Structures are given as structure tokens and as C-alpha cells.
Swiss-Prot record:
This is Phosphoribosyl-AMP cyclohydrolase. The lineage of its organism: Bacteria, Pseudomonadati, Pseudomonadota, Alphaproteobacteria, Sphingomonadales. It comes from the Bacteria. One of its GO terms (molecular function) is magnesium ion binding. Its EC number is 3.5.4.19. It is found in: Cytoplasm. PANTHER family: HISTIDINE BIOSYNTHESIS BIFUNCTIONAL PROTEIN, HISTIDINE BIOSYNTHESIS BIFUNCTIONAL PROTEIN HIS7. Belongs to the PRA-CH family. One of its GO terms (cellular component) is cytoplasm.
Length: 126
């Protein structure tokens, strides 16, 4: 089955024991990393059907559409799958900040050698 996933032209996601795949989300225009989330089969189907990014919330155990409360949705441009189909790359057009903190990206802090965190000026809150 693994060889088939590597060479097939069919979408056959390999879900983990919790029924999830990792989804890496980048801005389709800038290629900036926006967020990492998880998707189950329902989230993948909803995203493909609506063109809006949906994810599975592990903390709430619920399907959610990015932006359903904030208005900062993610319009799908392209969905890619990695070689063994256990991770997805979503190229999106964001309607606002991707992070719940109001920042463009969830990756706004750099981990320093001493274990401290440096806030990155190029990803200030909007």
C-alpha cells in the first residue's frame, strides 16, 4: 500500500491513529508559513467542497472553518499532498491574520540558543 501511495494519481490520505493528517498552511502569494493544523476526512471534504479551509480541533474535538468567528478565513488556492500522503500543504489566500493572536502567522517567535524567545518584528500584530 505504501508504494501505491507514492506512485498513484489517486488521493489516498494516510490518517494517523486519531484519524488526522497534518496540514501546513502557506500564503499562496508570498509563500509565508501561516499555521499548522490537523485535518480529518470531514475537514478535507469540507475544504474541497467549499474552497474554504476547514480543520479538526483536537482541543474541542470538533470540525471548524477557519474564520468562522473572526472573519479571517482562508480561501483554498491549491491542496498538495506529500509523497506518502500523511501531510497536506494548503496554499491559501488569507482574509486577515491567520493566528488567533491577531498576527499574520502563528510562527511569530524565534527560539534562541539560550531557550528564550524573540518576537519577530516582521510579523507584528495587525
Amino acid at each position: 500500500m505504501d508504494e501505491q501511495r507514492d506512485t498513484t494519481d489517486r488521493f489516498l490520505p494516510r490518517f494517523d491513529a486519531a484519524g488526522l493528517v497534518t496540514a501546513i498552511v502557506v500564503d499562496a502569494d508570498t509563500q509565508a508559513l501561516l499555521m499548522v493544523a490537523h485535518m480529518n476526512a470531514d475537514a478535507i471534504e469540507a475544504t474541497r467542497a467549499t474552497g474554504q479551509a476547514h480543520f479538526w480541533s483536537r482541543s474541542r474535538s470538533a470540525l471548524w472553518r477557519k474564520g468562522e468567528t473572526s472573519g479571517n478565513g482562508l480561501t483554498l488556492v491549491e491542496m498538495r499532498v506529500d509523497c506518502d500522503q500523511d501531510a497536506l500543504l494548503l496554499r491559501v489566500k488569507p482574509a486577515g491574520p491567520a493566528c488567533h493572536t491577531g498576527r499574520r502567522s502563528c510562527f511569530y517567535r524565534r527560539v534562541e540558543a539560550d531557550g528564550g524567545l524573540t518576537f519577530l518584528a516582521d510579523d507584528a500584530q495587525g
